[in-house]
Amino acid sequence: MELFLTGVVLKPKGLKGELKVKPVTDFPESFLTRREYYIGKTPEDAVLRKVQSARFHQGFAWLVFEGAGSREGAEALVGCGLYVTRDALVAMPDDRAYIHELIGLDVFDETEGRVGKISDVLQMPAHDVYEVDTGDRKVLIPAVEDFITETDLEKGMVRLKRFKEFL
């Protein structure tokens, strides 16, 4: 089963097992409606836990899980990731994509043809940056309209302009 990270447990609050969670999703409001998460240090060791209560405050989700209703139970989850299955992911608008959908896409230049594959997506404050593996080296390309002319998930490709400027 493939799991996707949506949040990271930062610290407990109080004596009743409430956890401060940093969302790592474009849809933080989903923490208010999702009733279960897989929790673990890695996706491989994550176990399914039901949400007892949820609230959102100052950019963080505050969750209480069944079976972790004490401070000690909450402290055991600090540093763990909160994961969901593919079918539990929020649907993206047509002009957006999840990072896992972008990694592995073939990258084409308007004049040179295929130049490599996206090997990673770096999330920067201003915009994402695609790491393109050309085979010889890795090149960082800002994921903005000035450089990305087309992204087609169905065809498995991204088209760039002015790629040589990054070499």
Swiss-Prot record:
InterPro entries: PRC_barrel-like_sf (IPR011033), PRC_RimM (IPR056792), RimM (IPR011961), RimM_N (IPR002676), RimM_N_sf (IPR036976), Transl_B-barrel_sf (IPR009000). Belongs to the RimM family. Pfam families: PRC_RimM, RimM. Keywords: Chaperone, Cytoplasm, Ribosome biogenesis, rRNA processing. This is Ribosome maturation factor RimM. One of its GO terms (molecular function) is ribosome binding. Binds ribosomal protein uS19. It is found in: Cytoplasm. Residues 94-166 form the PRC barrel domain. GO terms for biological process: ribosomal small subunit biogenesis; rRNA processing. It comes from Chlorobaculum tepidum (strain ATCC 49652 / DSM 12025 / NBRC 103806 / TLS). Its main location: cytoplasm. The PRC barrel domain binds ribosomal protein uS19. It comes from the Bacteria. GO terms for cellular component: cytoplasm; ribosome. An accessory protein needed during the final step in the assembly of 30S ribosomal subunit, possibly for assembly of the head region. Essential for efficient processing of 16S rRNA. May be needed both before and after RbfA during the maturation of 16S rRNA. It has affinity for free ribosomal 30S subunits but not for 70S ribosomes.
